[in-house]
Amino acid sequence: MSLLEEIAPSVQQVAEAIALAVGVEVEIVDNQLTIVGGTSVYMQRIGEKEESGEIDGNYLYARVLRTGNTEYITDAQNDQTYGITVDAFGSFELAEICTPIKADEHILGIIGLVALNEDQRSILLDKNKNMVKFVEKMAD
């Protein structure tokens, strides 16, 4: 069990607080790509693997886990390295800011700020630099 799974109720509270403060959806995964917390469609997927659990893959979350760098995807549907943009519930991911959760230089997981509609996408695009700084501070 990962550290984030051990504190899953707190992880879920953080996801909900970020979503309320920022106005976008939040997905939090651990270092094995297990969804540990989230809002909207991600809450329904807690316990499932993101990106099929392929931590050596080339999609967004696997890259962020490997590199430790924040990535900002402005057009998820047309970004071939993003991954699947629609889930079983029919929600389309339009944009995302994804940053690693670090402790003592170890990557514990990822926080993703996700736009599922144009209003949320506008929030991520309009406040790009501030949103990146915000999510990086939350992940520290």
Segments and roles (model prediction):
Residues 66-131:
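Sensory/regulatory domains in signal-transduction proteins
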Residues 2-93:
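Structured interaction and signal-relay segments at domain junctions
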Residues 1-17, 21, 109-140:
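Juxtadomain coupling helices with adjacent low-complexity linkers
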Residues 51-54, 60-62, 96-100, 122-123, ...:
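Glycine-rich loops and low-complexity Gly/Arg-rich segments
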